[in-house]
Every structure is written in C-alpha cells, then in structure tokens.
Amino acid sequence: MNFLPFLIAKRLYHRNNKNHAVLLVSILSKIGISISIFTLILSFSALNGFQILIKKNILSSLPHGIIELTNTSAFTWKDITKKLESLPEVIYSEPYVLMNSVLLKNDKMRFINIKSFKNIKYIKKYFSFQKKLYNFSKLKKIYNNEIIISSDLAKYFSLKEGDCINLIILNKKISFDKTQIQSFSFKVKSIFHSNGISNSNIGLIPFIFFQKFFNIKNNINKIELYMSDPFQADKIILKIAKKIKTPLFFYNWMYSYKYIYHDIKIIKTIIYVTLFLIIIISCFSVISICLTSISKKTKDIAILRSIGANNILIQLIFFYYGMRFIIIGNLIGLLTGIITVLNFKKIMFFLEKHFEENWFLKNVYYKNFLLLQINFFDLIIIFISTLTIGIVANWYPIYYASKINPNKILKEY
C-alpha cells in the first residue's frame, strides 16, 4: 500500500494549522460535526429507550394480538393455542374473555372490565418490571373466587389485599334480550400497578371462573397472544395466518395504539434529517478549507505534477486531507455520545446532587420516563452516513486539484 498521499496530506494539515483563519474554520467544522453526531446518538438512544419503556409500561399489560375464530366447530381454542405456541415469535397464548361488570364496595360503584387469565406465571412475568409495592411477586396460586385489581381501583375503593368486593357481571354472550346478569363476591388476592387508561379499570379473574359459571368451556372464539417483539406484530400476524391456514380475524395492539408506533418513526426521521443537514453544512466548511488550501498550494501541486505525480495521487492527497476533518469530528462525536449514554444515570445523579434548587432539574421529563439505550446498528448508520457525506463533499475540491495545469502555474513564477 502506498502511504505517500497520506503522508503529504498529513504534512499539509499541520502546515495549514499555522494559518489562524484556516485553523479557526477547521476547529468550527470539527465542533459542528461532533455536536451533530453527539446529538444524533443521544436522540436515537432516547427513542430506543422510549420503545423499551412502551414495551414494559404499556404493552406488558395489553394483549399484543387477538385472534377471533370464525368457526368454533372446526377448531377449538386449544387447537389454535397449540399451533401458536409452536412459533418462536409467540411467547404465550390463552383464551381471551372480557366482560363488563359493576364493582360495588362501601356505597361506591364503578363500571369496570373483567378479564380472564389462565396461567399465573405469565401474569407475574408481565408485571415483573413494576415496583413490588403490593407483593405481586409472591403470588403463587389463585382460586376462582379471587381477583387481581388495578391500583387505581384499589385507591378509589380504599381496598387492600384480603378485602371482599361484590361484582355484578353482564354476560353478552347469550343474546341481547337474554342478557345474563349475575352477582358474585370476590376476595382481593393482589393488586397490580396501573399504567394509565389501558388497564386502570380492569380486574383479572382466573379462566376457571368463567368456565364454571358461564359455561364457556369450548364456546370461546377469541385468543390473546403475547409476542417476543411487539413492534413486529404485523409481520408475526402474517406468519401466524400462514401457519394456521384457516379463516380468522386478526387484531394487534398497533390498531389501537398505532399513533405511538408511527410517531416514534416520524420523530426519528425528523431528527435524522435535521441533524444530517447540520453535518452537511459543517462539511461545506471543510470544502472551503480544502479549496483555500488548494489555492495556496497551486505551486506545490504544479511541481508534483511536473515531476510525475498523476491525477490519482493528487486526488488522494486532498481526499485524505478533507476526510481528516470529518473523521476526527465523527470520532469525537461518537465517543462523547457513547460515554454520555453509558454514564447517563451518574450524570443525572451528579446534577441532582449539586443543583437541588434548580427548577429545571425538578421538572424535566427524564425523571419519570426516560431511558437511554444504545443500538449498535444506529452507530454504524451514523458513522457510515457521515463518511458518505464527507466523501461527496470532498469530491469538488479533489476534482479541482486534479485539473490544475502545471505549465500555466509555473509560467507565473
């Protein structure tokens, strides 16, 4: 490998640093590129963390998908769940029963939904990320006359574990004119922390309760499923349809919360485009530095051409020279961004400790709902994209340098 172009470019770089104007522009270019990349890394890490928190705080308590059978005589819910659980993308599936009811306690009443669950192990798993305020992790077995309620309901009715409540359940499965209304007494077995509207008015009751009192052993046409990657729900649903090979209706969480998923993509695109425009502007200053250097070194270029240097050598010299600014700015931005993300909690702790009276630190969003998560794929995209912009930006100075006529230049001296 010929290192001559690189060595000449290095010498040219150090010589131009003695020129204060060129030095100032080069420093500002590096700062612009590094700040843009630093901001890109922080923004992408925040959005990646936001996706993780959505998965934990919202998608943990919602079915990722619901399958509705069109013909229960051809397939039972047990047949479908066996097929579903053979797919690696599906973590768990079970019958989906949701009924309307009225909760009565201490002269208070509230309309709530009651939902079935079949396996306590998976209920514990999906709420495992929460703070152990209600000893939810100790829950081992639940009977058909016991219920798990949300913290919002517990607060509204002043309930605690072991309290008894009355539920009037409305069963619409029969028909509108024969709607079955029944009253039941339940013991509060445990309480889970609510994550907002999605599960604030819900109670979880064992599936055996619905089998016993509503005679729905095989008359179930809906199955809920939880996926390993909820953000790929559309693709997983299509794979399920090919696997089952029977007419079914499919729903997934994106139909109800599609705006969250699309907003993340839109915000990520806007940040990406905006900051890369800043990088492009910074690269224009690199172009000006290269052109300034070329205009001052026309005599040297002419001498090199006269002693046998070809176009490729001249182009490589100024290619290395221009890319040096972009690579240095790129690496500074990447390193500072990665270090900041990895030490984000320590930085926030330090700021909170030393700025206790600071109004900004008391009211910012990160305290409650911000997680920074580095994605290696994002780092590669940022690095390669910046280098690509740098190569394109350096094209004109390289072309200009290679077209210098040595005869015309040397005649002037």
UniProtKB/Swiss-Prot annotation:
Family: Belongs to the ABC-4 integral membrane protein family. LolC/E subfamily.
UniProt entry keywords in alphabetical sequence: Cell membrane, Membrane, Transmembrane, Transmembrane helix
Top-level taxon of the source organism: Bacteria
Location within or outside the cell: Cell membrane
PANTHER family, A to Z: LIPOPROTEIN-RELEASING SYSTEM TRANSMEMBRANE PROTEIN LOLE
Membrane topology summary: Multi-pass membrane protein
Protein's name in the database: Uncharacterized membrane protein BUsg_286
The organism's taxonomic lineage, starting at the top: Bacteria, Pseudomonadati, Pseudomonadota, Gammaproteobacteria, Enterobacterales
GO cellular component terms given for this protein: plasma membrane protein complex
Listed transmembrane segments: 22-42, 270-290, 312-332, 379-399
Main location: membrane
BP-aspect Gene Ontology terms: lipoprotein localization to outer membrane
